[in-house]
């Protein structure tokens, strides 16, 4: 019996043949904390008798949720974390870098075959480069910071094989919303989802990040794409690493195999209040919106902004709609700036913000009031996620977001 890519990663790290279902103590290659989860994780580290983190170069610290500090508590948390970073010799990506998951990948802090944990549920995004990456709680993170290892129950793998060519203005976000609707919010609980097939092979890294980012929305422990030439090209200049083969064996045991063909896939919208309620945009076309948010670790990359800008063209956004554009990182912001996208969005009526989580976390800025409707390219639409529990959040692609912002209502991007 062969092995899945996840089993191979754990086998390499543990030095023995590991199979799904086994509980192992595995060394980790990276541990990420941000300004919300970091303070508690650090306190847990100290409570466990921690004095020095296992490896300062393997600890990743970022500020992205409440930046610049929007409260006295946030400011004090930032000071606390900066002090910890200085004492421990940890490089801190401060308020000017961007959203944690985007920065981790841009800076080469996750690589094929590695095990990386983060005190944030969307850490699974790093699977886009072929890493096993998963979110953990602050207590586990305190342990990881001290010992550089964690107990894992090696997950089974669901293989999602994707084929076909996307229609115009249909892409990775539409795909993952449709997969979430198919599998369900808890249909892959504590499993890894392996994205594979010809469509994935042709997909750029931005699209792969979008897919892996939302694996958690199906309850998955991780999302992962086997590294290929797209992966190794992305890693160039980010990490000095010699390409190597890493993929599931043909005779590996999978918990389930699912196949999807994107040829007939329509633009998708996840309706309130669950991510797995994705439906074709036509079923909610014409729905009134008050705010459009283009950004987040799910869809705030340069490629996403290009997608939105192509729909926008020389048109204007509906003045009755508040449009927030928030690039996922400083690097993505600069690329958009140099390409003239920022000016185009501003002239169209959007507010372009500095890289951060923004409305996605529901506690910083860009919140919606009771009765208001937000259409967002982010990853969650739970009740109260972006403000009032009496507001509504719909999820969509950057193309659908831009088209809807132009029309002032949910709109099929193929019709703009």
UniProtKB/Swiss-Prot annotation:
Q: Does the keyword Calcium apply?
A: no
Coiled-coil region list: none
Q: Does the keyword Signal apply?
A: no
GO MF term (any one): metal ion binding
| Entry's EC annotation | 4.2.1.33
Keyword vocabulary terms for this entry: 4Fe-4S, Amino-acid biosynthesis, Branched-chain amino acid biosynthesis, Iron, Iron-sulfur, Leucine biosynthesis, Lyase, Metal-binding
For the biological process aspect of GO, one term held by this record is: L-leucine biosynthetic process
The UniProt subunit note reads as follows:
Heterodimer of LeuC and LeuD.
What is the protein named? 3-isopropylmalate dehydratase large subunit
Which organism is this protein's natural source?
Methanoregula boonei (strain DSM 21154 / JCM 14090 / 6A8)
């Amino acid at each position: 019996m062969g092995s899945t890519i996840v089993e191979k990663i754990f086998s390499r790290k543990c030095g023995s043949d590991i199979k799904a279902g086994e509980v192992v103590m595995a060394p980790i290659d990276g541990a990420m904390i941000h300004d919300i989860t970091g303070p508690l994780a650090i306190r847990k580290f100290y409570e466990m008798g921690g004095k020095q983190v296992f490896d300062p170069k393997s600890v990743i610290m970022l500020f992205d949720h409440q930046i610049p500090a929007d409260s006295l508590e946030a400011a004090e948390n930032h000071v606390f974390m900066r002090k910890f970073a200085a004492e421990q010799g940890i490089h801190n990506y401060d308020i000017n870098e961007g959203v944690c998951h985007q920065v981790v990948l841009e800076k080469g802090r996750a690589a094929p075959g590695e095990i990386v944990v983060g005190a944030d549920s969307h850490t699974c995004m790093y699977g886009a480069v072929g890493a096993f990456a998963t979110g953990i709680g602050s207590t586990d993170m305190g342990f990881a910071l001290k010992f550089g290892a964690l107990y894992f129950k090696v997950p089974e793998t669901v293989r999602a094989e994707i084929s076909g060519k996307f229609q115009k203005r249909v892409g990775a976000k539409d795909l993952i919303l449709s997969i979430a609707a198919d599998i369900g919010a808890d249909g892959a609980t504590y499993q890894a989802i392996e994205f594979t097939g010809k469509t994935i092979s042709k997909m750029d890294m931005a699209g792969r990040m979008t897919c892996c980012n939302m694996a958690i929305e199906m309850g998955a422990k991780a999302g992962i794409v086997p590294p290929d030439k797209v992966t190794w090209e992305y890693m160039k200049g980010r990490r000095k690493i010699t390409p190597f083969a890493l993929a599931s064996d043909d005779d590996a045991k999978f918990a389930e195999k699912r196949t999807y063909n994107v040829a007939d896939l329509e633009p998708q919208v996840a309706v309130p209040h669950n991510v797995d309620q994705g439906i074709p945009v036509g079923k909610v076309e014409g729905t009134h919106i008050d705010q459009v948010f283009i950004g987040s670790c799910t869809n705030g990359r340069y490629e996403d902004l290009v997608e939105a800008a192509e729909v926008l063209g020389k048109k204007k956004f509906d003045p009755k709609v508040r449009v927030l554009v928030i690039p996922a990182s400083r690097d993505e912001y600069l690329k958009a700036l140099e390409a003239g996208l920022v000016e185009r969005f501003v002239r169209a009526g959007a507010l372009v913000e500095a890289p951060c989580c923004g409305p996605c976390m529901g506690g910083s800025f860009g919140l919606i009031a009771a009765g208001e409707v937000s259409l967002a390219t982010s990853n969650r639409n739970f009740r109260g996620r972006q403000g009032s529990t009496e507001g509504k959040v719909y999820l969509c692609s950057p193309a659908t977001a831009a088209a809807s912002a132009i029309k002032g209502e949910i709109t099929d991007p193929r019709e703009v």
